[in-house]
Each structure stands twice: as C-alpha cells, then as structure tokens.
C-alpha cells in the first residue's frame, strides 16, 4: 500500500480533497470510537493519524459561513459559537496520493518537500464577536505520531494504568491550548503554518 496513507501527511490531503467540494452544509462525521476522543491508542490498538482529523472535523458546526483558500469557517445553527479551520497544503502533492502504491514513489515526495518547504502566513479576522469566549486551539502537524515509539512496540491499552494511558495519549495528541477572552467586536490573529499543518480554532460563547 502507499506508505503515505498511514502517515501524518494524509490528514492534510484529505482535508484539501474535502474542501474542494464547496457547499453550505457540513457533512456529519462520526468517530468509530467516540469515547476515545482524540486518543490514538485505544482498546482496539493504535489508530492512524487521520483519526485526529476526524476528531477535529466532528467539532465543526453544521453550517459553513465562510470558505476560501485553505480555510473554512462553520457555525452550529442557533448558537454564537464559531469554528475556523486553517491548513497548509499544496496541490502539487495530489498525484502522489492519487497515484500507484509503490514505495518508490516516496522519492518524488521528498523532492517536492524540498521545493515546497515554506511556511504559510495567515492573518485571521473574526468580526461581530462580543462578550466572553473560550477559545480552544488544536494544532495537527505532519509528524508520524507512532515514530517516537518505533523501537518499543506499544502494549495493549488494557495493560496500562489509566494514568499511563492518559499521559501516553497526551504525547500522541495534537497540540492543544485554551484561552479565555473578553472580545469587544473582533478577534485578530497572525500565525504561520508549516506544510501539511492543520489548525482548528473553536470560539465558544460563555
């Protein structure tokens, strides 16, 4: 099989493919194991990095309110909460994901990465935001999550204590942070995204 399918690069490609189909409604995506949240190590074993993308998409509201070049904003009907999804993907990589499955195809991937290894600078402006908000930030990179444990196979989840399992899944999870802010009409943010990086911002009205 194509080695890219199980890698940390697959979420960026899938998101690019989904975003290419524009619409005013978000498809509902359900995680196979809802109790595990963004955990990659579950009682059924180690899940692939694309599972994290599904967990992020599940947080999007059902109505698309803005969409453009590598960004998407959604809102849940009847609520003031807004979710903004940003990503950095170059369509020149499409043929490597859509082509054959030979391992030799990793060579052109490395060459393309050399030519397109640049950060994308994004300025985000969210208006008509007044009041207290909890802002959750999730950052998903192209890192191969299981690589750090390659020399030590992960044990079955039921062999680990609840605390060890919690910490282990924390090391495998996307980078997460939370800010509590009082907004007076707008929110501005400038940031940089590395190739294949995905960022989800969730604005929750308190």
Task: For every predicted segment, state its role.
Residues 45, 55-62, 130, 141-145, ...:
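Generic secondary-structure transition motif, activating predominantly at the C-termini of alpha-helices
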Residues 136, 143-174:
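An alpha-helical appendage that flanks or caps ligand/catalytic pockets
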Residues 20-26, 57-62, 125-129, 180-183, ...:
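A structural motif corresponding to the C-terminal end of an alpha-helix
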Residues 1-105:
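Aromatic/acidic polysaccharide-binding cleft in carbohydrate-active enzymes
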Residues 160-206:
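C-terminal beta-strand-rich structural cap/linker in extracellular carbohydrate-active enzymes
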Residues 36, 47, 117-119, 182-186:
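Short, solvent-exposed coil/turn segments
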Residues 70-153, 195-202:
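Carbohydrate-binding surface patches
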